[in-house]
């Protein structure tokens, strides 16, 4: 890179000349203004724009501004008007102190021409400060014996203003003792002096108050003042003097310690130590110093000890006063003590009995005491008294002795202890009295038996209470005390239901709390009568009895018990018959239940919980009658399953359910064609049923597989033109036939030949279940066939299928059940009031077994219903005369809502037919009703 060419020297010289020219021009251009101090902010100092010959708007264009530095900016440039104004209040005294000339400089820069303008502003003083003294008050001490003409310097005033506004002179207020003289120093400062004109007397006037005034020459004139206190210093030229030569005072005896007796006073006109007077006792005796005290500064005489008139009634005290230098004065204080009734009577008990039996006779001496008063005259006369409401009296014997006696017989139950206050009062003014307290205990005797607050008690206990439960707390009161009031509780011995009462309840002998020793059952007993005895421990003991009725409250703790229909022992359900010709409202059967509870807990309601055919049957809410809700149709399934729930109204409610199987057919043979419910073999070693089931399942499976194979072959023949379907068919040849259940035509086959094997834990009791086949001569729809349930066939029935002689015979159309022949509780036929229920579950099971046995005989056609051996007497027992009756004694507790009857031994009416006569369990067979 080439080096830059060197500048010629004449260029540098040109710059220096220009700079010098600017400096010369700057010095030449200087502006001077003046302004008074204490002007408001924004006050105009001068017009910069006018002095520079510029228009106001050119100031901003040319960049005119103040560049002064180093101190607070006092001025500002108004850019609109071009004037120089004050930036705040200006204090000349703060800025220039006492300098006679106060000038401040500032510089203004013109940026376009780089010119600096120098401006001087003179601050003109105003009289804004008055003369002031350093202190508002000055004290000057002058001895009272000072000679006239003596000078005393006074404080100087200061005025920060200058010139004529500064301090000009002093003035002193007029007085008869002092004058003012002002001296001027070489520096021009004036010094004021105080001059004593005549002799002083402190006792005449101790302090002189003067006012010194300083003033300036401003307009208006300002001034300042200072207070001058001339304090005269005393000399000891006077002795103390008492206000009285003798002081007389009277005081009552026994005044409190510290009481002010009187104040002695001595005066001394001197001041300070010369006038400070102190007091003291003169010729002090020990007795005086113990009873009286003199304050050495104030002269107060106070009581230091107890004054007693009996000791001394008069005191003579010498008092002395002296000032600081030692001048003294003397006086006397004469004290008279006044007598007062200051002694209260004294009571001394010489004999006292602290306790007395409540049976003591009137006039028994309780105490003997003496009274004494150390005062004399009326102050020593004493009278004694006791409260009027007490059963005691005072008797004065001799001298000042008194006896305290009983006035009547005492009763400890009314008042067990007496606090007797004996008051002894003298006749002084004011009277003084003394109280003595005598405590007397009244000893108890056993004269009150325990009492119960109630004549009898009743307690209510819910049944099923836990053993040891608290039933009731019984409390007896005995107004006696001690052992006479210690009560024990017991139960009177008795028996209930052959057992002692002590096995049912017990009572705490100390607290009277009754406890249950067993869990009560409302169904066993409902109330218990007890006799509670309360005995005290006195000698002899006293006692009282009170009766207690214990009522057991019923709880809903018994589930409704279904009496009919009963549950068979083989876990199957009973079968009820409903003819297909039955209309709406036909009584199929009746559910009968009882509840061992009472009240609402035994109020039962019936409702249909579940039905295989909704809307076909209805159950009476309060009667339990199962009736048809509509007429039976041919499409209705042969077997209908109903679940009836029986619920009480307890809290919480309890319920029981029963499952009813209703066979829809006109006669039993119609039912037995497809329905069987026989008792399984009881032989546990018999395995024939299991083998038979296995063989049957295998045979049916083979037939089903063959059918599916044939059906598949027909389908493949129809689709043989399709190679794809042919290939799929060859792959399906090894698939089990059960995969093709959904093929058309199989559904009808399955309806006819489908089967189900129910294997329970005991395979010998397993059932083979067949669905009812569809016959061409029956009018059962496909839907009803699908809804029908499988029928149970036990092993005994299956074994008969192998015998050709045991084939089902045609049903006998005469063997039909009428409405009156159905088992029920309220009489499904015309019965008498003496008909009975089955005595137990065994009878009900026997009834179902006979129905099934008869159905088996009807199936093989080997017997009739004439009551022979083969029928087990079905026609004789399964008729109107065999009605169910509930035997237990709690039937009368059952209330059937909706009727006025209760469950009794009489059979209810049904279907509006009158009952037939009969006795005991032997009933005449009713006529069969034909539909």
Swiss-Prot record:
- Which sites does the entry annotate for glycosylation? 419, 545
Region Disordered, as annotated, extends over 801-840, 901-931
Q: Where are the bilayer-spanning segments?
A: 693-713
Residues in compartment: Cytoplasmic: 714-931
Ranges in the Extracellular compartment? Answer: 29-692
tRNA-binding: is it a keyword of this entry?
no
* Entry's Gene Ontology molecular function annotations: calcium ion binding
Q: Where is the composition biased (Polar residues)?
A: 805-840
Where it mainly occurs, coarsely classed, is membrane
This molecule's function is given as: Potential calcium-dependent cell-adhesion protein. May be involved in the establishment and maintenance of specific neuronal connections in the brain.
Which protein is depicted?
A: Protocadherin gamma-A4
């Amino acid at each position: 890179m080439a080096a830059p060419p060197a500048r010629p020297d004449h260029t540098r010289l040109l710059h220096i000349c220009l700079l010098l020219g600017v400096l010369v021009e700057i010095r030449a251009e200087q502006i001077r203004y003046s302004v008074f101090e204490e002007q408001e902010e924004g006050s105009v100092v001068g017009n910069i724009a006018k002095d520079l010959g510029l228009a106001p708007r050119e100031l901003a264009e040319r960049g005119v501004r103040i560049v002064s530095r180093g101190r607070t900016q006092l001025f500002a440039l108004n850019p609109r008007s071009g004037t120089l104004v004050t930036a705040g209040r200006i204090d000349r005294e703060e800025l220039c102190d006492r300098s006679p000339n106060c000038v401040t400089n500032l510089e203004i820069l013109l940026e376009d021409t780089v010119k600096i303008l120098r401006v001087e502003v003179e601050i003109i003083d105003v009289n804004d400060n008055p003369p002031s003294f350093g202190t508002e008050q000055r004290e000057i001490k002058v001895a009272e014996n000072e000679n006239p003409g003596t000078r005393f310097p006074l404080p100087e005033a200061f005025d920060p203003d200058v010139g004529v506004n500064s301090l000009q002179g002093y003035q002193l207020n007029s007085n008869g003792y002092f004058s003012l003289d002002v001296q001027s120093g070489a520096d021009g400062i004036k010094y004021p002096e105080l001059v004593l004109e005549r002799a002083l007397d402190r006792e005449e006037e101790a302090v002189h108050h003067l006012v010194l005034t300083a003033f300036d020459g401003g307009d208006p004139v300002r001034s300042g003042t200072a207070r001058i206190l001339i304090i005269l210093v005393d000399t000891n030229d006077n002795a103390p003097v008492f206000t009285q030569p003798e002081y007389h005072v009277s005081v009552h005896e026994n005044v409190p310690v510290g009481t002010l007796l009187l104040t002695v006073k001595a005066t001394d006109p001197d001041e300070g130590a010369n006038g400070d007077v102190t007091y003291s006792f003169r010729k002090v005796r020990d007795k005086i110093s113990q009873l009286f005290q003199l304050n050495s500064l104030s002269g107060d005489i106070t009581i230091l000890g107890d004054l007693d008139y009996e000791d001394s009634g008069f005191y003579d005290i010498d008092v002395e006063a002296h000032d600081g230098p030692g001048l003294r004065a003397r006086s006397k204080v004469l004290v008279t003590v006044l007598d007062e009734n200051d002694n209260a009577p004294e009571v001394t008990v010489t004999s006292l009995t602290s306790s007395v039996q409540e049976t003591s006779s009137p006039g028994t001496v309780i105490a003997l005491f003496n009274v004494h008063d150390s005062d004399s005259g009326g102050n020593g006369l004493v009278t004694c008294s006791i409260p009027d409401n007490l059963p005691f009296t005072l008797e004065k014997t001799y001298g000042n002795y008194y006896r305290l006696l009983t006035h009547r017989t005492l009763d400890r139950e009314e008042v067990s202890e007496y606090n007797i206050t004996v008051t002894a009062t003298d006749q002084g003014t004011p009277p003084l009295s003394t109280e003595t307290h005598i405590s007397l205990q009244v000893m108890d005797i056993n004269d009150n038996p325990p009492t119960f607050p109630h004549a009898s008690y009743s307690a209510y206990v819910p049944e099923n209470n836990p053993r040891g439960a608290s039933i009731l707390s019984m409390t007896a009161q005995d107004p006696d005390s001690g052992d006479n009031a210690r009560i024990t509780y017991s139960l009177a011995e008795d028996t209930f239901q052959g057992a002692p009462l002590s096995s049912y309840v017990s009572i705490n002998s100390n607290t009277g709390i009754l406890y249950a020793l067993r869990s009560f059952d409302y169904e066993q007993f409902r109330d218990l009568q007890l006799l509670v005895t309360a005995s005290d421990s006195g000698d002899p003991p006293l006692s009282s009895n009170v009766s207690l009725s214990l009522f057991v409250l019923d709880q809903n703790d018994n589930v409704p018990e279904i009496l009919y229909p009963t549950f068979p022992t083989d876990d199957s359900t009973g079968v009820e018959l409903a003819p297909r010709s039955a209309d709406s409202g036909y009584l199929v059967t009746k559910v009968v239940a009882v509840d061992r509870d009472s009240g609402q807990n035994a109020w039962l309601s019936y409702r249909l919980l579940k039905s295989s055919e909704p809307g076909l049957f209805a159950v009476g809410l309060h009667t339990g009658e199962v009736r048809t809700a509509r007429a039976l149709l041919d499409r209705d399934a042969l077997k209908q399953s109903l679940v009836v729930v029986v619920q009480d109204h307890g809290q919480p409610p309890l319920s029981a359910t029963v499952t009813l199987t209703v066979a829809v057919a006109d006669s039993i043979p119609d039912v037995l064609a497809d329905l069987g419910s026989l008792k399984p073999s009881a032989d546990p070693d018999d395995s024939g049923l299991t083998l038979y089931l296995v063989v049957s399942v295998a045979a049916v499976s083979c037939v089903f597989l063959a059918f599916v194979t044939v059906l598949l072959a027909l389908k493949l023949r129809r689709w043989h033109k399709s190679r794809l379907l042919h290939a799929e068919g060859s792959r399906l040849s090894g698939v089990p036939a059960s995969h093709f259940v959904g093929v058309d035509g199989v559904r009808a086959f399955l309806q006819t030949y489908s089967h189900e094997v129910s294997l329970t834990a005991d395979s010998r009791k397993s059932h083979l279940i067949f669905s009812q086949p569809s016959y061409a001569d029956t009018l059962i729809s496909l839907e009803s066939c699908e809804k029908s349930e499988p029928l149970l066939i036990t092993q005994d029935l299956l074994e008969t299928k192998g015998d050709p002689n045991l084939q089902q015979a045609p049903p006998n159309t005469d063997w039909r059940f009428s409405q009156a022949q159905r088992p029920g509780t309220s009489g499904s036929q015309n019965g008498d009031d003496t008909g009975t229920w089955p005595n137990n579950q065994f009878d009900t099971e026997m009834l179902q077994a006979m129905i099934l046995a008869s159905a088996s005989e009807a199936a093989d056609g080997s017997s009739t219903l004439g009551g022979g051996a083969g029928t087990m007497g079905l026609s004789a027992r399964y008729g109107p005369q065999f009605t169910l009756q509930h035997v237990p004694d709690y039937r009368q507790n059952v209330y059937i809502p909706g009727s006025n009857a209760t469950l009794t031994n009489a059979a209810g009416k049904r279907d509006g037919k009158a009952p037939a006569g009969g006795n005991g369990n032997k009933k005449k067979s009713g006529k069969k009703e034909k539909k």
